[in-house]
Amino acid sequence: MVDYDGNYVDMYVVNTATGERKSALKKLRSNTNFTQNDWSPDGNWVIYFQNKHWHALNTADGISKNLTQALGVAVHNEQHDAPAPAGAYGTGGWTSDSTSLLIYDRFDVWQVYVDGRKAQNLTRGEGRKSTIRLRVQRI
C-alpha cells in the first residue's frame, strides 16, 4: 500500500520444508528501515526497526521483543527533521551464537540480548562524552 503516510510491507515466516506461511508482522514501514532487517546467523530471529525502537521477532513462535526500550538513549536519529519517521542509527550485526546483536545510538555501541539480559554499552559512553560516533568496522 502506498499513500500519504508512506510505503508499508507485511512480513511472513515460511517453513521451507512444508511451504506453510504465517503472518509475522503487519504494516512495517518500507521506506525508512525495512532494508535494515537482519536475520540471526541461526535463522531463529529477525530484527526490525519500528516506532523508534529495535525489535526481535522469534521466527519459531512469532513473538516480538522490544530490544531497546530500556536503554535510556535514543537509537533513532534525534536530529531528523522531516515529515516522516526518523530512521535508526543502525546495527553492527549479530554475534555468531545468535544470542545478541550490536546496536548503535548516536555515539555509542550497545550489545542487546534476545533472551532479555540487560544490555551493555560496549563503548562505556566514551562516544557520547567525546561527541564522537563509535561504530564497528569489519576488517
Where are the language model's segments positioned?
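Hydrophobic beta-strand positions that form the internal "hydrophobic ladder"
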Residues: M1, G43-V46, S98-L101
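Short, conserved, GDST-rich strand-edge loop motifs in beta-rich repeat architectures
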Residues: M1-Y8, H76-G93, T99
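Short loop/turn segments that connect beta-strands within the blades of beta-propeller domains
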Residues: N7, D42, Q50-K52, A60, ...
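Beta-propeller blade signature
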Residues: Y8-G19, A56-N58, G62
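Predominantly a core beta-strand signature of beta-propeller blades
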Residues: G19-S23, G62-K65, R117-Q120
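Blade-loop segments of beta-propeller domains
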Residues: S23-D38
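Surface-exposed loop and turn segments in beta-propeller and other repeat-based domains
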Residues: L25-R29, S64-A86, T123-I139
